[in-house]
Amino acid sequence: MNRPPLPPLREDLLSIWTAGVDAVRAPRLMRQAVQSDARQLTVCGETWLWSDLGRLIVIGAGKAGAGMAGALEEILGPEIVQQRVTGWVNVPADCVRGLRRITLHPGRPAGVNEPTAEGLFGSERILELASSLRPVDLCLVLISGGGSALLPAPVAGISLGDKQAVTRFLMSSGATINELNTVRKRLSRIKGGGLALACGNVQVGNQGADTPRSPAGGGLAAAGGQSRVVSLIISDVVGDPLDIIASGPTVLDTSSPRQALEILKKFGAAPPHVPQAVFDVLEQAAQRWSAPLPLPDTIRNVVIGNNAVALSAAAARAVELGYRVESLGSDNQGEASAVGRELARRCLAERATTSRPRPVCLLSGGEPIVHLTATARPRRGGRNQQLVLAALLELESAGLEDIALLAGGTDGEDGPTDAAGALLDSEVRNQALSLDLDPQDFLQRCDAYSFFEPCGGLVLTGPTHTNVMDLRVALIR
C-alpha cells in the first residue's frame, strides 16, 4: 500500500517546534508542580496545611514570570489568594498584566536583555518582601530565564550604569551565559544566594541550597521556626546548573571574585568599556573573600522545566507525523554560524545514507553565541537567524526540495528583534534568489533579519512566557 504524500515540510516544522514550546509553557509546568485545595498546599511533593501557614509570599523574575504567577493564582483560587498571597515579580514590559495579589512589574523593555532603573526599583521591592518573612510564612520564588537582567541590585560601589556597561561588554564579546552570570553574581546583592540570605529568619545551616528534601508536611514547624523558601525554576542553561540560572538568587555561590576578574581579563575588559569601579570592587572583594557557609536546608530549589522537556514533546509530535527521530541533545553550544553549518552537514549526511529510513527529524537544543564586530552592531539579527543563514550557505548548492530546518528561541525572542528565529526551506531559498540576496553578505554583517524578512523566513511568535533556550528542528524527506 502506497504511503499518502507527506504534508509540506514547513507545516511539519512549525507543528513540531510549537509542540516543544507548548510543553514548557509556564502554566502547564506550574500545574504539574503546585496543587492546592481548601485544606492544604502541595509544592513539588511537599505539603503544608493552610492552618499551619501565615502569608504566602511570591517573588521572582524572568521571562516566564508572568505565566508562572498567573497560573499560581489560578491554582490557589481567589479566596486563598485574597487571604494569603502577596507578591512581586519582575517581568519584561510586554508580559505585564493585572493579577489579584501578585504585582507584575515591568523590569525591562521587551527585547532589551540588560539591567534597567525599573528593574532596580522592582528588585528593591523584592528584597523588602523577602526580609519581611516570618517563621510562619512560606515563600515561593519564581525563577526563569532572563531573570539575571531583571534582578539588578548592585553592590556598594557599583552603579546601575556600571552593571549595564559590563553586561553589554560581555554579551557583545561572546561570553557564555555561565561566564556572564559568574561576573553578575559578584556584583549583585540578590544573585548568588543573595535573595535567600535576605529572607527573614533564615540562618546559615549545614545543608546546601540545592539539596532535595523529602516531603515533611506539618507546615513550617518542621523547619525549626525558620522561613520556608521554595524556588520553582524553569531552566534556560545547558545542564541546568542552579547557580547559573538567573544567576542563582536562592543558590549558594561557590565562585569567587577572582574568577570574575579572570573572565573580564579573558575578554580584554578595560576602561572605558568596563568602568574602573567594577575592577576596584572585585579586587577589594577578592582580598577579603573566603569560602561561603552553606545555605540552610529550609531553602529548596526545584527545576520544573528545561530544554529536555521541550525536546521530548517535539519528538513525540514528530513521531505522530511519521518521522524517525534523531536527538542531537540539549547541549549544543558554540558559535552560531558553526552550529548551523554542522547541522546542515548532518542533514546532507542523512539524505545521502541508504541504511536508515526516511523521513527523519533531527532535534537539538542549546544556546549558541554570535561574535559581533564593530561594523555588525547596528544590524538586525539573533543567534538563531544567524545559525539558519549559515546553514543555507552549506545547503544552497545541494538543493532544498527535501530538506527544511527551523531554529528558534523558546521565549519568542532572538536577539534585539521581534522574531523567535528563522526557518529555511525551498520557498525561502527561491525567494532569496528572486530578490538577488547574497546570504554570505548578510551573514558577515550579522544582518540575518534583513535577509529573512523579505523571504518569509522569520518565525514570529510573540512572547511565549517561557524560556528553555533554543529548539531546532531539521526535516529530511
Please annotate each region the language model reported:
Residues 199, 204, 213-216, 224, ...:
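Accessory alpha-helical/coil subdomains and C-terminal extensions
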Residues 384-477:
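Internal helix-turn-beta structural module
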Residues 135-139, 147-208, 213-246, 254-260, ...:
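Conserved phosphate- and dinucleotide-binding cores of soluble alpha/beta proteins
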Residues 59-61, 88-91, 140-145, 171, ...:
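Short beta-strand segments
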